[in-house]
């Protein structure tokens, strides 16, 4: 189970990337499970099924900050940890520097990043279709998508002058 807060894509994509980092590629379907709300805030839950039998559950919280929390359950034990959000970008920059210096690094490969986006798009398609299982291979340009321009404008408005033209 992976959890993030902020919005369904900006923070949610990092949860999908974390799933890829833990499980690898091979996601087959995503299913929207539902929404819970309280005091004007809401969370949504999604189920991801992989070809190798592994499954993942991720939750997004909209309009409220939540830490990145990961719980891994196996047939033998459970493990839970919270990512230190104050160090995430520092860690990413260190890995980018290693990559640029041709040193070993832990950056996600392109197939993992692409599958992360497909997981999010399949989740949006499932939500739009009332919670049906959506195969990643069935995604099309006609399905739900994310509006990069609208995202950038909202992000810039919330973040200040650094992100404006």
For the regions a language model picked out, list residue spans one by one.
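Short glycine/serine- and small hydrophobic-enriched flexible loop segments
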Residues: 20-21, 98, 122
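C-terminal helix-rich "cap/oligomerization" subdomain common to oxidoreductases
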Residues: 102-165
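A general structural signal for well-ordered alpha-helical segments in protein cores
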Residues: 15-16, 89, 93, 120
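Short, well-ordered secondary-structure micro-motifs
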Residues: 12-13, 70, 147
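Rossmann-like dinucleotide-binding domain that binds NAD(P)(H)
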Residues: 1-65, 111-118
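C-terminal substrate-binding/catalytic lobe of Rossmann-fold NAD(P)-dependent oxidoreductases
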Residues: 41-99
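Short secondary-structure transition/capping segments
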Residues: 1-4, 21-29, 48-55, 76-88, ...
